[in-house]
Amino acid sequence: MPENVTVIGAGLAGSEATWQLAKRGIHVDLYEMRPKKETPAHETGEFAELVCTNSMRSNQLSNAVGLLKEEMRHLDSLIMKAADMTQVPAGGALAVDRDSFSKYVTDTLKGMDNVTVHEEEIVKIPEDGITIIATGPLTSDALAKQIQAFSGTDSLHFFDAAAPIIAADSIDMDIVYKKSRYDRGEAAYLNCPMSKEQYEKFANELIKAETAQLHGFENSDVFEGCMPIEVMAARGAKTMLFGPLKPVGLEDPHTGETPYAVVQLRQDNAAASMYNIVGFQTHLKFGEQKRVFSMIPGLENARFVRYGKMHRNTYMASPNVLTASYEAKNRPGLFFAGQMTGVEGYVESAGSGLVAGINAAREALGKETVAFPKNTALGSMANYVTTTSAKHFQPMNASFALLPALEGKKIRKKRERHEKISERGLASLDAFKTEVLD
């Protein structure tokens, strides 16, 4: 009979790991401290709660995270199944109804006979047995100290932020218009057009706005992919125009012209009663968010369902600690998964949980752990977090830069080249699944 496995943390990585274990017949003891003990960012006790955006980014195979998603679908990922079941309109991206998404994951795992859920905090790394630690970037202090001592290095960190969510019925639809950039796919976003004068006034007030105090925060500590909008604005007068306020491909049907700047709103739930402000992660004080963001055309009377906020994310110096199976080098049977390993992003975190879960299951069944092929997105992420120089280690999203170049004549068109890399990755994964995993 296979050994039981303990999974600590029911976020994206822990939930995916639990699913991969349980569907292989392994009994899982899943520990989650919420809702009994809260974190600075979570609001519910549900599994796989999305604390920042509701977007899982591109769904296209010309994008590395699109490849990662498709690889996970090929391996029967619970997180991808939940995302596909609860998606909301978002053009070429995959966005979800965050409440329905978490409920799907929670109900699925709690409904499995070989998953026992324990609502309690774990404060020590278990000394024996097969364990996956997937407690995320908001790991409780007691366990974080244990992990720091185990890894033999100081915890590394960066700051992450969430964007505000506003009520749909408070948006002025006489000003705002529905459109996706370059009219790709369905018209999935609401767009708030700005003139040059409106943009400059907004940018000026944004830079002057008062931020919430957060211990240890420095502007240099932010993750580039989730930068607070006020930090971006302070980098230069036009910086936002090349980021979330980029107007290209978003002509205003009211005027037939491209606005100077455009703020986009993305549907946040299936009922379309809430929208988040795309790219507006922030740590402004709540009153300042209301004052400054209400300067956006169409949001003058916006009702804020949730204000944006920032939290500290910690991660390990994984190259010193982990193998490509996410198993600890000096402690067989102990695995780590999720953002604490240095992968960055919802899908990347779930992907690491998938790899760790499959390998923990193999160990429980008396098989050898395996490294995924480096020409797959899953394998390239594992390779990055375990072989990069620990001295310069930083969190990383899925990227084609992590994958080996194609052999033969170079394909000049980037989209076509990336699609070929994805095609190669999926073929490699399917062969690996047949020859090694099945």
Curated annotation (Swiss-Prot):
Record's keyword annotation contains NADP: yes
Q: Name one GO cellular component term.
A: cytosol
State the organism named in the record: Lactobacillus acidophilus (strain ATCC 700396 / NCK56 / N2 / NCFM)
| Presence of keyword Cytoplasm | yes
Q: Could you tell me where this protein is found in the cell?
A: Cytoplasm
Descriptive protein name: Methylenetetrahydrofolate--tRNA-(uracil-5-)-methyltransferase TrmFO
Q: What is its EC number?
A: 2.1.1.74
Q: What is its main location?
A: cytoplasm
Catalysis: reaction(s):
uridine(54) in tRNA + (6R)-5,10-methylene-5,6,7,8-tetrahydrofolate + NADH + H(+) = 5-methyluridine(54) in tRNA + (6S)-5,6,7,8-tetrahydrofolate + NAD(+); uridine(54) in tRNA + (6R)-5,10-methylene-5,6,7,8-tetrahydrofolate + NADPH + H(+) = 5-methyluridine(54) in tRNA + (6S)-5,6,7,8-tetrahydrofolate + NADP(+)
